[in-house]
């Protein structure tokens, strides 16, 4: 149980159909967080039941976008600090100790960043642009809001940023099916956002940007040091980039999207 002489902490999670992951996510924080808040946009796989069984407060809502859904969860929090997690993330014991130290001793920082250790098809990547992948997820509740973006939301705040050393553990892409689904989802959302801004694309730009995505991931970001998974990730990034530009081109030609958009945050 949380100590009574420290600042309080709420964990907020935005989810849909995360039954395979969200239990372990909540278990990594429930013994030391004061509150766990889950905003669910219509799960049909038992996600909500799992969350309630583990003591989380669950709110079922529509899907207004990444930033607004996170802001809804943030508005339900009543604690001094907030930790925002995805269902496929876990807090390591080392990171937990760093966070508790801040809660116990206080801090002048508004937000803390931390590295994220992400797995691709069973391998935790050390290159390929996936490490250290610092993210800002731990913050003072009253001084931060979320800003919406096509496939990610980010924090808006005034103040300084502190750094944790230990990582969040991120079970990002478990298999090739998930990699293909993510490439499709993100390319659809990215094309829609570019279309809304009046941007255009051609077959040549799709091929060029796709090839560059592979070179950047595999060569410049040293994905070759991540073994077979590094090559697979580079191909996946190239594919997603190529299809983002192709879908943008098709939007201008036909006025309709091809593929499906993701309905959950993956950061």
Which residues make up each language-model segment?
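A conserved acidic beta->alpha catalytic loop
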Residues: 28, 32, 40-52, 86
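Conserved beta-strand segments of alpha/beta enzyme cores
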Residues: 35, 57, 160-162
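Conserved donor nucleotide-binding strand/loop of the catalytic core
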Residues: 48-76
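Catalytic metal- and UDP-sugar-binding loop of GT-A-like glycosyltransferases, i.e.
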Residues: 61, 85-87
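Catalytic-site signature of metal-activated, phosphate-bearing donor transferases
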Residues: 67-74, 80-85, 92-255
């Amino acid at each position: 149980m949380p100590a009574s002489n420290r600042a309080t902490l709420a964990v907020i999670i935005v989810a849909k159909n995360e039954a395979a992951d969200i239990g372990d996510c909540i278990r990594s924080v429930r013994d030391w967080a004061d509150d766990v808040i889950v905003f669910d946009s219509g799960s049909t796989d038992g996600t909500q039941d799992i969350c309630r069984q583990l003591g989380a407060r669950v709110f079922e809502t529509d899907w207004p976008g990444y930033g607004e859904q996170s802001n809804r969860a943030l508005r339900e929090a009543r604690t001094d600090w907030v930790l925002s997690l995805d269902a496929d993330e876990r807090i390591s014991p080392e990171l937990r100790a760093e966070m508790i130290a801040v809660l116990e001793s206080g801090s002048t920082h508004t937000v803390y960043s931390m590295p994220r250790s992400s797995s691709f098809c069973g391998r935790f990547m050390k290159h390929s642009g996936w490490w250290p992948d610092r993210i800002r997820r731990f913050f003072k509740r009253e001084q931060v809001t979320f800003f919406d973006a096509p496939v990610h939301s980010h924090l808006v705040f005034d103040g300084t940023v502190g750094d944790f050393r230990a990582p969040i553990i991120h079970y990002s892409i478990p298999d090739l099916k998930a990699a293909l689904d993510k490439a499709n989802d993100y390319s659809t959302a990215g094309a829609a956002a570019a279309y809304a801004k009046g941007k255009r694309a051609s077959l040549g730009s799709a091929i060029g940007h796709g090839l560059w995505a592979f070179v950047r991931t595999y060569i410049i970001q040293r994905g070759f040091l991540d073994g077979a998974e590094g090559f697979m990730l580079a191909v996946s990034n190239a594919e997603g980039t190529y299809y983002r530009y192709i879908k943008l081109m098709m939007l201008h030609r036909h006025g309709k999207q091809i593929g499906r958009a993701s309905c959950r945050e993956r950061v």
